[in-house]
Swiss-Prot record:
Record organism: Danio rerio (Zebrafish)
InterPro entries: Ribosomal_uS10, Ribosomal_uS10_dom, Ribosomal_uS10_dom_sf, Ribosomal_uS10m
Subunit structure: Component of the mitochondrial ribosome small subunit (28S) which comprises a 12S rRNA and about 30 distinct proteins.
Compartment(s) where it occurs, according to its Swiss-Prot or TrEMBL record: Mitochondrion
Gene3D superfamilies documented for this protein: Ribosomal protein S10 domain (3.30.70.600)
GO terms of biological process kind: translation
GO CC term (a single one): mitochondrion
Annotated gene: mrps10
Chief place of localization: mitochondrion
SMART domains in UniProt: Ribosomal_S10
Keywords on record: Mitochondrion, Ribonucleoprotein, Ribosomal protein
Protein name: Small ribosomal subunit protein uS10m
Entry similarity comment: Belongs to the universal ribosomal protein uS10 family.
Ribonucleoprotein keyword on record: yes
Amino acid sequence: MAASMANFRTLRVLSKIFHGHFTAASAVQHHTACPRLVHTVSVFSPPSPAITESEEPDTLYQRLSVQVKGHDRAVLDSYEFFATLAAKELGLSLEKVFEPPKHIDKLTLLKSRHIFKKHRVQYEMRTHYRCIQISRITGSSARVYLEYIQRNLPEGVAMEVTKTAMEKIPEHIQKPLWDDNKPEASG
C-alpha cells in the first residue's frame, strides 16, 4: 500500500510538471541528491546547413543482391529478418528473399593415428545461405543500406554483395544500322 501511494505521488508530481503547474527547480527541490540546476532548452535551433548537390548523376542499380552465409541457422534467420526490416524502413523494393540450398562438407578421419582402420570419426560442417535481392535502387541508397547492414553483421557470418548497374545505351548502338544503309531514291 505504501509503495502504491509513493508511485501515485510521483505520478501526480510528474503530471503537474508536464501541465506547467510546477517549474523544474521546485519539482526536484525536495530531493537532496539532485543538483539544483535548471537546464534550459532553446525551442528554435539554428538552421541546418544547406544540402549539397553534386553535378554527377547518381548510379542506378537494376538489382542489388546480398548473400550471407554462416554455420548457425538461427543467427542467419535473425539477420535476414533484420536486413529485410531495414530495407522496408528505408523504402527499398524487396524483389526476392530466399534460402539457397545448404552446403555440407564431410571429413572422415581415423580415431587412432596408425591402426584400427574400422574405427573412424566423421565431422560435418554445414554452411547455410540467405539471399536478399533488392530491385531498382540508387547508388546513394545502396551505400547507406549496405553500410548499415554491414555494421550490424553478426560474428561468424560472411557477406557477398553483387550489384547490377543500369547503363545508358551508347549513341552508336541506339541508331539502327538500316537507317545508314538506305538506298537513295533515283529520280
